[in-house]
Amino acid sequence: MKKSRFAALAVAASLVTMSAVAIAPAAHASSCEAKQLGSVIAEVCSGKTSDGANYEYRTNTENFNGTVYLWSHGYRYAVNLPAGIQPPGGTTPYIVDMSAEVGPSTYVVNQLLAAGYAVAGSGFDTQGWTVGSAIKTNVELIGILKSELPDTKGVIAWGASMGGFITQALAERFPKLIKSAAPICTAAGNVNAELTYAQDLLWGMKTFFDPSITVSGYADGPAGVGQAALNLQKVIAVLTHIGTTILETDNSK
């Protein structure tokens, strides 16, 4: 009798487990709506991967050619920054951004949609240096895309800065999941290498253009992140000045 009860409980537990596994994908099903994006009426779908990353993909419903561009965004700060400290491309005060990103700009995304491509991307499950988990998120997102867009013939992975390195690593580890990759302005392969690269750049900027730029000795925690953000603003100001000077020189010829 005891054995029969045990067997019945085991079977019931197995059925519950199998049911949970069977319905798990539904928990991550995308929510879709039609939107006018540039010259295209696109289906914009969003959801979350199993690690909690927000994702989005957009499809030209009238002219999808079967190719999806999978974008990996660059480095985003992992802490909030107070007003007055504005990271490049961010806002002030800066709030950690977990939103999905499907391309480098609205213009580029809309041009791809108009040409018949679909675009996709996520916000990853965390910010900061997040290469490892970002690759995992991308692998899962590719599975979602191929499931929900059955006409998909291939995926092109692309990304910029840290997103470029994520793209490169994805292509090396999972070459069969994509048909091509386009790493853009790729970051160095790990945090130490990236910091060394950044220090070299800062040293050059400090030596030749702005002695107030800090190369090392940052404070711990958010205060140090704030110092780094201010430094980046100074570097951008230097680069802007250089670019303006070059244009003025060219125009004077």
Label each region the model flagged.
Residues 128-149:
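Alpha/beta-hydrolase active-site loop
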Residues 66-76:
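Short beta-strand element of the alpha/beta-hydrolase
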Residues 2-29:
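Secretory targeting and sorting signals
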Residues 30-68:
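N-terminal cap/lid segment of alpha/beta-hydrolase-fold proteins
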Residues 32-42, 187-253:
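Accessory cap/linker subdomain of secreted extracellular hydrolases
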Residues 154-207:
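Primarily recognizes the serine-hydrolase "nucleophile elbow" in alpha/beta-hydrolase
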Residues 106-128:
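Conserved alpha/beta-hydrolase
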Residues 79-93, 131-134, 169-171, 191-197:
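Short, solvent-exposed loop/turn and secondary-structure capping segments
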